[in-house]
Amino acid sequence: MTENSTSAPAAKPKRAKASKKSTDHPKYSDMVVAAIQAEKNRAGSSRQSIQKYIKSHYKVGENADSQIKLSIKRLVTTGVLKQTKGVGASGSFRLAKSDEPKKSVAFKKTKKEIKKVATPKKASKPKKAASKAPTKKPKATPVKKAKKKLAATPKKAKKPKTVKAKPVKASKPKKAKPVKPKAKSSAKRAGKKK
């Protein structure tokens, strides 16, 4: 019974600590947005200036710098912030909310551009796929057809070849040789009859 009573109050202080942490300062993302709004720099505010503002205006823990970096990255990925200079968490950042009407137009333009850019890519990919596919299909299908036809076509194929070959090759010798002997024999027979 005593163990349960001691474990229950132990959980309460943890909740209290959590509530204290939440009451000390707002979310890091909110603080970053507030810092950028307070600076109102057209070129955008740097991460260092954002950190200075947050540390001076809010009670923040020791890991504030890493939390600010993470929140800046999240805000950039979600589209709340625009990165004007630099890469990642370094560089300068602006609020994208102030450019909402421009952003909506920009989004429409970018979507159209993406569609325009995507359609040629899609068109080129199917062309490549189509060019590859027909080459693959004829390679694969003729083999199958050839195998199936081999049973039937060899007879058909041999017949036309042999028929063409025999009349051309055999007709000349047969006609040439038999005609000559017939002519000779007929001449001999005619001579004998005379």
Swiss-Prot record:
**Protein's cellular compartments:** Nucleus; Chromosome
Q: What is its main location?
A: nucleus
Q: What is this protein called?
A: Histone H1.0
State the function annotated in the UniProt record: Histones H1 are necessary for the condensation of nucleosome chains into higher-order structures. The histones H1.0 are found in cells that are in terminal stages of differentiation or that have low rates of cell division.
- N-acetylthreonine, modified sites: 2
Instruction: Give all Citrulline modified positions.
Output: 42
Note down the stretches annotated as region Disordered: 1-29, 84-194
Q: Which residues carry this modification: ADP-ribosylserine?
A: 104
Q: State the GO CC annotations.
A: nucleosome; nucleus
Taxonomic path: Eukaryota, Metazoa, Chordata, Craniata, Vertebrata
Q: Which family does it belong to?
A: Belongs to the histone H1/H5 family.
> What does its PTM field state?
ADP-ribosylated on Ser-104 in response to DNA damage.
List compositional bias (Low complexity) regions by residue number: 1-11
- Provide a Gene Ontology MF annotation, just one: nucleosomal DNA binding
